[in-house]
């Protein structure tokens, strides 16, 4: 398969599974994905040991192949200014912070779009950016339960619900986010406009409750 997204630059401000899955898919399609990690510490999957490869978490290596990387402290002015400079020459920003975090840092979508009107912001959250759970953090285990996914797995109807072994809502949310970004890129090619893309672990769980 050809590198269809060659020339597309993605700033991945995401960690653990859902966001990095999306970034991984875009990188595999040829996009230049620059992973922005917090400092100190970096992506939490760096600490997912064992297994490891020469002391580096296998989970981290798996989720971040084909990506470039930079560490930024976005709580400091210098880090914010570097990020704003990067936005000027980027196409997509991918993040999975809690609702309002980017706005508190002074780099919400309104600010990004003034710097680069063609920028696409993709937000992955636990329960979406609206609704009663919008301010809550999200985790695969909880999303599998609250979406009803666990109710259709397990041994039989007389036994307790059972978690799907794989982090299914994380992975599916990454797939949904990548699909949304691809659609937004096509829309931008037609109109010249950037936009926000929003998906969630809850939405990803609902997908599997047919």
Go through the PLM ranges and name each one.
Residues 1-190:
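N-terminal helix-loop segment corresponding to the beta1-alpha1 unit
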Residues 185-210:
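Substrate-binding/catalytic subdomain of NAD(P)-dependent oxidoreductase enzymes
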């Amino acid at each position: 398969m050809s590198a269809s997204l060659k020339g597309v630059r993605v700033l991945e401000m995401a960690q653990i599974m859902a966001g990095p899955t999306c970034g991984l898919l875009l990188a595999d399609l040829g996009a230049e994905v620059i992973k922005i990690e917090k400092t100190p510490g970096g992506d939490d999957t760096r600490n997912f040991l064992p297994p490891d490869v020469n002391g580096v978490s296998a989970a981290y290596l798996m989720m971040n192949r084909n990506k470039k990387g930079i560490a930024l402290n976005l709580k400091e002015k210098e880090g914010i200014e570097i990020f704003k400079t990067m936005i000027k020459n980027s196409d997509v920003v991918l993040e999975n912070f809690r609702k309002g975090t980017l706005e508190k840092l002074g780099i919400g979508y309104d600010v990004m779009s003034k710097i680069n009107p063609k920028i696409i912001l993709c937000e992955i959250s636990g329960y979406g950016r609206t609704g009663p759970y919008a301010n809550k953090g999200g985790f695969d285990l909880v999303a599998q339960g609250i979406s009803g996914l666990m109710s259709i797995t397990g041994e039989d109807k007389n036994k307790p619900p059972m978690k799907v072994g794989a982090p299914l809502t994380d992975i599916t949310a990454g797939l949904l986010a990548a699909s949304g970004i691809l659609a937004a890129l096509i829309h931008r090619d037609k109109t010249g406009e950037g936009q926000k893309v929003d998906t969630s672990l809850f939405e990803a769980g609902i997908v599997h409750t047919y």
